């Protein structure tokens, strides 16, 4: 099985497990997507680099501990708790799913360490880049694949707050340059 095929298998398996978990809990559907859109005062090429390179990620989000390989099957690992035990540092094990240069970047994401029951399951994050006049970029982040039940509700509530903060941090990073 190729690495890309394995990625798709892992995603489908994670979503099936989430669905079965939700069904076992009496839920009918997965939780709604999280969608955040920002207009960034930078050209698409700069915003793209901010998301697809370790240096870019470190410039607005993660401390000096990011591993980003912007190819399908490549790593998308950000460590927020550098001194935490292995598996509890950040997005260890998360992978890039799809890359359409300067248009779309898709990666896996996991629950924070405080929610261990679903930490090995993954959601997907889609970033869509749209060029605007005056060297600006409309960036839309869509995070989906949340199951239902208490742990998934905690995870979703966390990222309902976290993703807008991350996007705001990116916006400020480029506003500071303008």
Indicate where each model-derived feature is located.
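Short amphipathic
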Residues: 33-39
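Bacterial N-terminal signal peptides that target proteins for export
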Residues: 1-13
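Hydrophobic-ligand binding "helix-grip"
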Residues: 66-67, 86-134, 144
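Short beta-edge strand/loop motif at the mouth of beta-sheet-based domains
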Residues: 55-91
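Bacterial N-terminal signal peptides
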Residues: 10-22
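Boundary at the C-terminal end of the N-terminal hydrophobic targeting segment
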Residues: 24-27
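A conserved amphipathic terminal alpha-helix motif
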Residues: 138, 145-178
């Amino acid at each position: 099985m190729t690495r890309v095929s394995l990625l798709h298998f892992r995603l489908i398996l994670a979503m099936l497990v989430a669905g079965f978990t939700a069904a076992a809990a009496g839920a009918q559907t997965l939780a709604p997507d999280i969608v955040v859109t920002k207009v960034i005062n930078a050209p698409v090429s700069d915003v793209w680099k901010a998301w697809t390179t370790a240096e870019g990620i470190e410039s607005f989000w993660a401390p000096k501990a990011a591993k980003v390989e912007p190819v399908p099957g490549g790593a998308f690992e950000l460590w927020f708790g550098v001194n935490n035990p292995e598996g509890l540092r950040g997005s260890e094990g998360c992978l890039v799913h799809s890359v359409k240069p300067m248009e779309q970047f898709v990666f896996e994401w996991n629950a924070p360490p405080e929610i261990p029951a679903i930490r090995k399951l993954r959601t997907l994050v889609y970033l869509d880049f749209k060029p605007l006049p005056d060297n600006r970029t409309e960036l839309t982040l869509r995070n989906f694949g949340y199951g239902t039940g208490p742990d998934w509700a905690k995870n979703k509530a966390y990222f309902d707050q976290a993703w807008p903060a991350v996007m705001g941090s990116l916006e400020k990073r480029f506003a500071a340059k303008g």
